[in-house]
Amino acid sequence: MLITLEGIDGSGKSTAHAALRERLTAEETTFTREPTDSWYGSAVERSIGDADADPLAELFLYTADHADHLSRVVRPALEAGEPVVSDRYSDSRYAYQGATLEGVIDEPMAYVKRVHEPFTRPPDATLYFDVPPTVGAERAGATNKFEAADYLESVRENYERLIEAEPERFHRIDATQSESAVVEAAVETVETLLSR
């Protein structure tokens, strides 16, 4: 089973991912994230810090990192029968790069999805950490181009479109709650999913 954690910056998904890693010890589970720690992921991280990075080039950096992640980590773990829990995955690309490419290409989120469809492995379930963009930006510190509240509003709208298209896959977590409440909701949801 592939479970992904999604939400705008500052929503608490990385904190929940760390807590899940600590608390889910009953069975072998692969915990991973995107961007990865590969050289592809390093290129993505450099791009995040570059306010002038070309948005289309940036999309393909993220896509290369995702392809490597699939072949190196996700598919081998799933083939070995291990559940995978990923902090960010393809939906982040659809939501974030869909917002970044707005005004650059027509129907950007649909374009990004079409780029991924031939090779990606869709998640079985996704925890969506829902928080208002102003709260997310404040929590994240708005230290890069992807953490500004107005940009995060566009990203959140894209996430809502994804949820509307696949409501059965998404499990919404109210990330305006305390950190401990968010973590508990995430742990409970993942434990339920893994027990199916």
From Swiss-Prot:
Q: Can you tell me which residues bind ATP?
A: 7-14
Coiled-coil segments on the chain, per record: none
Sorted alphabetically, which InterPro entries does this protein's record hold? P-loop_NTPase (IPR027417), Thymidylate_kin-like_dom (IPR039430), Thymidylate_kinase (IPR018094)
Give Gene Ontology CC terms.
cytoplasm
What domain of life is recorded for the organism? Archaea
Listed EC numbers: 2.7.4.9
The protein depicted here goes by the name: Probable thymidylate kinase
Primary gene name: tmk
